[in-house]
Curated annotation (Swiss-Prot):
Topology feature Cytoplasmic, residues: 652-1053
Gene designation per UniProt: GHR1
Lineage: Eukaryota, Viridiplantae, Streptophyta, Embryophyta, Tracheophyta
Signal peptide as annotated in the record: 1-18
Membrane topology: Single-pass type I membrane protein
Protein name (record): LRR receptor-like serine/threonine-protein kinase GHR1
Length: 1053
């Protein structure tokens, strides 16, 4: 009996012990404590010590997988968790096989004891916010089969110990900030099936030995800085089926690209490198491939015949230097399975025969030198781009084309009228015939012949006659481009409702009459351009109903009456000048600069106190009242004298208070109008910074309270305006002057998280708080400081304005991509700070001295040094083009904010480096729109960006901005200055175009350069060549060359 009692007690005791928290449970509960945010409650509502199984494993907890009494798996993917993760806790889970927490907002570092996870086979921490370097002990995790750390901010080199992961089958470390050479030890991972190290900053040569990994199926190294020669042995011997080494710096030394390609490779991408030579005439390079992408290289010669190539499905050879004719085999219907063919951006010539292939869906032959008439047949083509060639003839051949949905024939030499015969393009949704020589009128049956049309562009031809009656009422149309023709008649009729039209451009035609009163029915309209017509009457009040309108231009017409009282608050571009409008400008339009309203509109009045109202009055009455000019000039002179007297008074006061201090003069940017020569005549130049300041208001309206206090310490170049033209990054201040600090309230004010993109800087938030910080300037997205660290190192700190930055996770993922950007002509970003409040977002980058291009170029008070010589200016232009070429082709990102103040000159040699790049990727849509709007006011915005409600920077908009900068370099003038004189209020680009069109292009050059040009014919030739390049850069987007071409052309001068 006693023995039975003992047994029962023992069983009860063991049962009770089973309910005690195990080592596994304690580790999980400790991890739970680090979770700051769990939007779904998946973890916080489930993990508790009251729901534990009898065997001691919490299998009822969400995301937990048990094996017996032990935790075997923790799966917390895609939950939006925010946590400071301590992964060393999981070393206590001795039977853990799978740990997966991808796509959250987890931060922290990998533990040094990662190698003690003896049973771990699957580790996925991708798409989080982890940082720091990889621990050397990671190579001791010999049981790991799958390791994914992609989409984080890991930095430093991959440790050689990675070669110890002998069981590894899949390794993904893409989209991090890893750098250094690829370790040779990776080639010893004999079981590896998948290797992805793309979008990092790896340098050096690709190690030999990857071809010896017999199991390797996928090798992805794209988006790094790997250099050296293509390894022909790898391509011949590898067993991989997918190879992507695009976006690196690989070169070739022999005349042939490769001696051959392994039969196992099906997908090969070597685009965006520096490969030269020609393609082999044999078929061994292509016979087993399904996808081949060699675009954006420097390959040349004629294309091979592509005989006996049966498996190729995608062939991309765009933007190289191929010449000769187009191989007919590529367009046959019986020799290839080709679905996509892109040969654009080469030097191919000759005609294009009929396209017989029934499998070819996408054919891009744009930007070549192809001639002849259109092909008779297009086979199964759905997308056909033949733009920017030398095709001629009429358009009647397309009557037999059946499957086309996207057709671009722009920038050719087509003549005749728009076909009226019934075509087969019933599926067409995009039709671009711009920049040809088409004549006649548009047929009335367009809506029935093209029932699915969304985009119609027939701009820049010689069309006549009215708009077809039902065209504007087509239910599918979203964009209509009819500008730059000779069309006549009234505009209309318009649909009463249901219109999808987002863009309507009828500018530079001969339309007349009144606007339809039902204009407000175009409720989706975002861009409306009716400029340079003969329209009259009043602007219909129904325009107030177009709430999505972001760009409105009705200038150069004969409109009368008042402006609509309540136009859309989304309008970012506005121009009603050269009309006969009257009344008072509505309050919601008063912040647009005077050139939006004047010249013309002599009876139109800006509200009292509106920015620039005095300037507008001067402009409005200029042609009829010369007395006003005199008054303005005298007023400016008096104001200037007063400013000088005030400056002298302040100087005396400062000197009396602190004799040892030197007066800081010349620090305030001149905000007044300046009189400079305009060609052969004088003229007034209105600074674009004034327009930005007018639109923004005072600095207090855009700065956080902390920034206001920093500015108030005396380092703001202006306390009355939002500065968009800063004096440059090289401004210096007396050492004994009281410096502004980032910690304007207390030394420990920065209490958030400071992340660095590499290991070159070690700094805490508190140390950054203590750093003296001089204000360099302000822009639409924040304030820039020069911070002096304790070790004497300078950093540029950009304090982002409240509300412009994206959410933390997206911001962090984007900013870490910058760590891969390393180039002598690009300013290096070092890190970022994320504070606990909305206005505490900082970006840290290298400080560049002596200053910006603007501070050396413009003839303004405080200009640094003597005027730049031609050799210096040309070198700066080449440097900037080289930096942009790197961003576009090596990093595949547009700059997005290119202007003279963002080109910094480094050292005594004035090496140019572009700064403030890719900020649009860190900002909200509103922040991006505001940045682009400022670029428009300052003269750098590409015209196409005004045609989008949600504009985003692009490669082509960068080229436009670079063209404007070239004009600044040539003229010495600021892009945003409004130049008046012989012409009425034109900006820099229009002024240069006018001079060139009149055969007076040489009058545009800076007087300093003109003196050099007169004594050196080589200089004169170079300046004229750069002027030609600049004019190409500011063409319409479809005619604009890529930066690669521009860089090569500039380098050859």
């Amino acid at each position: 009996m006693n023995l039975s009692r003992i047994l029962l007690l023992s069983m009860f005791f063991l049962s009770a012990m089973g309910q005690l928290p195990s080592q596994d449970i304690m580790a999980l509960l400790e991890f739970k404590k680090g979770i700051k945010h769990d939007p779904t409650g998946f973890v916080l509502n489930s993990w508790n010590d009251e729901s534990i199984d009898f065997n001691g494993c919490p299998s009822s907890w969400n995301g937990i997988v048990c094996n017996g009494g032990n935790v075997a798996g923790v799966v917390l993917d895609n939950l939006g968790l925010t946590a400071d993760a301590d992964f060393s806790l999981f070393s206590n889970l001795t039977k853990l096989v799978k740990l997966s927490m991808s796509n959250n907002s987890l931060s922290g570092v990998l533990p040094n004891d990662l190698g003690s996870f003896k049973s771990l086979q699957f580790l996925d921490l991708s798409d989080n916010l982890f940082s720091s370097s990889l621990p050397k002990e990671i190579g001791r995790s010999v049981s790991l089969r799958n390791l994914s750390l992609s989409g984080n901010n890991f930095s430093g080199e991959i440790p050689e110990s990675m070669g110890g992961l002998i069981s590894l089958q899949s390794l993904d470390m893409s989209s991090n900030s890893l750098s250094g050479p690829l370790p040779k030890s990776l080639t010893r991972l004999n079981d590896l099936l998948y290797l992805n190290l793309s979008s990092n900053g790896f340098t050096g040569k690709m190690p030999r030995g990857f071809e010896l990994i017999s199991s390797l199926e996928v090798l992805d190294l794209h988006g790094n800085s790997i250099d050296g020669n293509l390894d022909g042995e790898f391509f011949l011997l590898t067993n991989a089926s997918y190879v992507d080494i695009s976006g690196n710096r690989l070169v070739t030394t022999s005349g042939k690209l490769l001696p051959g390609v392994s039969e196992s490779i099906k997908h090969l991408n070597l685009s965006h490198n520096q490969l030269e030579g020609s393609l082999t005439s044999g078929f061994q390079l292509f016979q087993n491939l399904k996808v081949l992408d060699l675009s954006y290289n420097m390959l040349s010669g004629e294309l091979p015949g592509f005989n006996y190539v049966y498996d190729l499905e995608v062939l991309k050879l765009s933007n190289n230097r191929f010449s000769g004719s187009l191989p007919n085999n590529l367009l046959k219907g019986d020799s290839l399975l080709l679905t996509t063919l892109d040969l654009s951006g080469n030097n191919l010539s000759g005609p294009v025969s009929s396209i017989m292939s029934t499998t070819l869906h996408t054919l891009d032959l744009s930007s070549n030198s192809l001639t002849g008439e259109l092909p008779l047949l297009t086979g199964g083509c759905v997308l056909l781009d033949l733009s920017n060639n030398q095709f001629e003839g009429n358009l009647t051949r397309w009557s037999k084309w059946e499957n086309i949905e996207y057709l671009d024939l722009s920038q050719n030499h087509f003549t005749g009228s728009f076909p009226d015969a019934t075509p087969q393009l019933l599926r067409a949704n995009h039709l671009n015939l711009s920049y040809n020589k088409l004549t006649g009128s548009l047929p009335e049956r367009i809506p029935t012949h093209y029932p699915k049309l969304r985009v119609l562009d027939i701009s820049s031809n010689s069309l006549e006659g009215p708009i077809p009656g039902a065209l504007l009422s087509m239910p599918t149309l979203e964009e209509i481009h009819l500008q730059n023709n000779g069309m006549t008649g009234n505009i209309g009729p318009l649909p009463s409702s249901g219109s999808r039209i987002r863009l309507l451009d009828l500018s530079h035609n001969r339309f007349d009459g009144d606007l339809p009163g039902v204009f407000g029915s175009l409720t989706n309209l975002q861009v409306l351009n009716l400029a340079a017509n003969n329209l009259s009457g009043s602007l219909p009040s129904s325009m107030n109903d177009i709430v999505s309108l972001s760009s409105l231009d009705v200038s150069q017409n004969h409109f009368t009456g008042p402006l609509p009282s309540n136009l859309s608050s989304n309008i970012m571009a506005f121009n009603v000048s050269y009309n006969d409008l009257s009344g008072t400008v509505p309050e919601n339009l008063k912040n647009f600069p005077p050139p939006s309203f004047y010249p013309g509109n002599s009876k139109l009045v800006l509200p009292a106190g509106s920015p620039g109202s005095s300037a507008s009055e001067a402009s409005k009455n200029k042609s009829t009242n010369k007395l006003v000019k005199v008054v303005i000039i005298v007023s400016c002179a008096v104001a200037l004298i007063i400013l000088i007297l005030v400056a002298i008074l302040l100087f005396c006061i400062c000197k009396s208070r602190r004799r040892e201090e030197r007066s800081i003069t010349g620090k305030e940017t001149n905000r007044r109008a300046q009189t400079i020569p305009s060609g052969s005549g004088g003229g007034m130049v209105v600074s674009a910074e004034d327009l930005v300041a007018s639109r923004k208001g005072s600095s207090s309206e855009i700065l956080s309270p902390d920034e206001k206090l920093a500015v108030a310490t005396g380092f703001s170049p202006s306390k009355t305006s939002n500065l968009s033209w800063s004096p440059g990054s090289g401004d210096s201040f007396p050492a004994d002057q009281q410096l502004a600090r980032l910690d304007v309230r207390s030394p420990d004010r920065l209490v958030g998280e400071l992340h660095f993109l590499d290991d070159s800087i070690k700094l805490t938030p508190e140390e950054l708080s203590r750093a003296p910080a001089e204000v360099l300037g302000r822009s639409s997205h924040g304030t820039s400081y020069r911070a002096t660290l304790d070790n004497g190192v300078f950093l540029t700190v950009k304090w982002l304005r409240e509300g412009v930055a994206k959410q933390r996770k997206e911001f962090a993922k984007e900013v870490k991509k910058f760590s891969n950007i390393r180039h002598p002509n690009v300013v290096t970003l070092r890190g970022y700070y994320w504070g606990p409040t909305q206005h505490e977002k900082l970006i840290l980058s290298d400080y560049i001295s002596p200053g910006s291009l603007a501070s050396f170029l413009y003839d303004r008070p405080g200009r640094k040094g003597p005027p730049l010589a031609w050799t210096q200016r040309l070198k700066i232009a080449v440097d900037v083009a080289r930096g942009l070429n790197y961003l576009h082709f090596d990093r595949a990102v547009p700059h997005g904010n290119l202007k003279a103040t963002n080109i910094l000159l480094d050292g005594a040699e004035l090496n140019a480096r572009v700064a403030d790049y890719c900020l649009h990727r860190l900002m909200t849509q509103a922040g991006t729109v505001e940045q682009i709007l400022d670029a428009g006011i300052l003269g750098y915005r590409a015209p196409e960006l005004a045609a989008s409600r949600k504009p985003l920077p692009s490669f082509k908009s960068d080229v436009y901005a670079f063209g404007v900068i070239l004009l600044e370099i040539l003229t010495g003038r600021c892009a945003g200055d409004v130049i008046t004189g012989e012409q009425e209020g034109v900006d820099l680009t229009d002024w240069v175009r006018l001079r060139v069109a009149e055969g007076r292009g040489a009058e545009c050059f800076d007087s300093v350069l003109t003196q050099e040009m007169g004594s050196d014919p080589v200089t004169e030739k170079g300046m004229k060549e750069v002027l030609g390049i600049a004019l190409r850069c500011i063409r319409s987007v479809s005619e604009r060359p890529g930066i690669k071409t521009i860089y090569e052309d500039l380098s050859s001068i």
